Curated annotation (Swiss-Prot):
This is Peptidyl-tRNA hydrolase. Hydrolyzes ribosome-free peptidyl-tRNAs (with 1 or more amino acids incorporated), which drop off the ribosome during protein synthesis, or as a result of ribosome stalling. Catalyzes the release of premature peptidyl moieties from peptidyl-tRNA molecules trapped in stalled 50S ribosomal subunits, and thus maintains levels of free tRNAs and 50S ribosomes. It comes from the Bacteria. Its EC number is 3.1.1.29. Disulfide bonds: none annotated. InterPro entries: Pept_tRNA_hydro (IPR001328), Pept_tRNA_hydro_CS (IPR018171), Pept_tRNA_hydro_sf (IPR036416). The record marks D95 as: Stabilizes the basic form of H active site to accept a proton. GO terms for biological process: protein quality control for misfolded or incompletely synthesized proteins; rescue of stalled ribosome. It is found in: Cytoplasm. Keywords: Cytoplasm, Hydrolase, RNA-binding, tRNA-binding. It catalyses: an N-acyl-L-alpha-aminoacyl-tRNA + H2O = an N-acyl-L-amino acid + a tRNA + H(+). Monomer. TRNA binds at Y17, Y68, N70, N116.
Length: 194
């Protein structure tokens, strides 16, 4: 049972990307920081916004890379390397085209599925892909050629409300995630209705 020591929220930096679908992971980490009453601060050493809190005596670090999505691994590798955090102690939250809005799923390992942030993290961790992923459903535009504009666009209010509700649900299973109770966390999360 592996406890999580680092939670990464993927997104793109800058006000123009703040509320876009591609920043679902960053939104998740912001919500954790708010719930824990901590501020995320810019740290050039780790190429991102960072924060730290303690859960039952265990340090948990938060990271939102301030690199663009396709360089997210630079931030993850810098922070994980400095604090000697193993890939299996990392949870990466990211937007997921293959899940509808309002659905969130946990997964250990696997490929990048075309997600440039995951692709770079895997590469920067020395081709190790055995980190946990929180896949936050954003839906799919239906046509591959529309994906880029879709993920970089803002979700309509109804879709955003579903994403917010799924993040709230995940926040409720965080104690299991922090404790390394992955089977229980997955069972609870995967029984959620969109």
């Amino acid at each position: 049972m592996t406890a999580i020591k680092l939670i990464v929220g993927l997104g793109n930096p800058g006000a123009e990307y703040e509320q876009t679908r591609h920043n679902a992971g960053a939104l998740f980490v912001e919500r954790i920081a708010h719930a824990q009453g901590i501020n995320l601060v810019a740290d050039r050493k780790y190429f991102g916004l960072t924060g730290r809190f303690s859960h039952q005596g265990q340090d948990v670090r938060l990271l939102i890379p301030t690199t663009y999505m396709n360089r997210s691994g630079q931030a993850v590798a810098a922070l994980a390397g400095f604090f000697r955090i193993k890939p299996e102690e990392i949870l990466v939250a990211h937007d997921e085209l293959d899940l509808p809005p309002g659905v969130a799923k946990l997964k250990l390992g696997g490929g990048h599925g075309g997600h440039n942030g995951l692709r770079d993290i895997i590469a920067q961790l020395g081709n190790q892909n055995n980190f946990y992923r929180l896949r936050l459903g954003i839906g799919h535009p239906g046509v591959a050629s529309m994906v880029s504009n879709f993920v970089l666009g803002r979700a309509p209010r109804a879709e955003q409300e579903k994403l917010d509700a799924s993040i709230d649900f995940v926040l409720g299973v965080l104690p299991d995630i922090f404790a390394g109770e992955w089977n229980r966390a997955m069972k609870n999360l995967h029984s959620q209705k969109a």
